[in-house]
Amino acid sequence: MAAEIICVGTELLLGDIVNTNAQYLALELAKLGIPHYYQTVVGDNVERLKKAIAIARERSSILIFTGGLGPTPDDLTTETIADFFQTSLREDQEILAEIEAKFTSLGREMPPSNSKQALIPMGADFLPNPTGTAPGMIWQPEANVTILTFPGVPSEMKRMWVETAIPYLESQGWGKERIYSRYLKFRGIGESALAEKVAHLFDLTNPTVAPYASLGEVRLRIATKAPSLEAALQVIEPVATEIKEIAGLDYFGADDDTLPAVVGELLRWQKQTLSVAESCTGGGLGEIITQIAGSSDYFGGGVISYDNRVKVALLDVNEGDLNNFGAVSAIVAQQMALGVQKRLATDWGISITGIAGPGGGSETKPVGLVYIGLASPEGNVTVSEHRFGENRDRLTIRQISAYTALDRLRRNLLIMS
């Protein structure tokens, strides 16, 4: 039997609030090994919520609701569920006292409207809310239907899920075998190209392998259902090892690894330092490098040489080359990388110069054209040309440029290690 998530709130339908609750609960259900095939978002409307319940009860055995537990007239979840199952509500004096105590602790008197939060269907149990005033409930109105309700505030919902809902579900026999996943991360290769290399693994049933793509990055999820992490790793790790061998340098990390953190560890391990010279990214590369705590161990700093005069004055870029080839050129990227490496006395120097748009492009130098220079400790400089696409927006081109530059450094550090 499966679970279904029903998120209540007109603000979700209007896009005023991002529905992070559904994502969190979906991940949690997967961890518990509870099948989950449907999600529904319903506005604050009694009849539409009843229709959603009617559909859900026919195809799912655990109905998880978020939102609509507040004190205002449009908070209708509890009474609508009770009415659907033709059950009357009761006022729980203990819960009412707890709500009043929370207001008292804040030096406030409880508004009369909050008393509705102490209402619960006959036969249901409250899910305590340690931080907010809206408790949830656990209720089995029918033999094959279990209902759990949570407030829409994510922090409150998450704590209630962990402290009360998970123990309850486990006590009912759910979660004996959980789904364990490992995410392998790749850069410098597209989703389709990577999929072709590991196509034979997509037919596996234990573990399963599935690709996911995001901006400039591809992930492969390796998942299995097992009674313990140790048992899961015995199934996952051989497949992960095979994929890493196939991918080679395109593989950069797993699970919570980030590219800036991986590059930082490589620099720290090799006792080397880095500086950057940026034009079109405007400091974006330096920003992602310094997201990592302790990055001062290996990051010397950067020069944002947006103006050509700064390129000449601080990076020793040849003014004649700027005039002849333009700021967006391989020769200028080369000189920028060498210039910042020398100026800040670091082992490595990275440069980025390009056209992020939306204007400034031409037939020969379109928007999305970016040159990335990399100066090595030996004094060698390599420059790569990239065309990130005229149809991409400015922010995307800047982000891809910064991460591509960092990935170029990662590959060189691995080759030299």
From Swiss-Prot:
- Which SUPFAM superfamilies does the entry mention? CinA-like, Molybdenum cofactor biosynthesis proteins
Among Pfam families, the record links this protein to: CinA, CinA_KH, MoCF_biosynth
Q: InterPro entries attached here?
A: CinA, CinA-like_C, CinA_C, CinA_KH, Competence-induced_CinA, MoaB/Mog-like_dom_sf, MoaB/Mog_dom
Record's PANTHER family?
Answer: NICOTINAMIDE-NUCLEOTIDE AMIDOHYDROLASE PNCC, NMN AMIDOHYDROLASE-LIKE PROTEIN YFAY
Matches recorded under NCBIfam families: cinA_nterm, PncC_domain, PRK00549.1
Q: Which family does it belong to?
A: Belongs to the CinA family.
Name it.
Answer: CinA-like protein
Q: What is the lineage of its organism?
A: Bacteria, Bacillati, Cyanobacteriota, Cyanophyceae, Oscillatoriophycideae
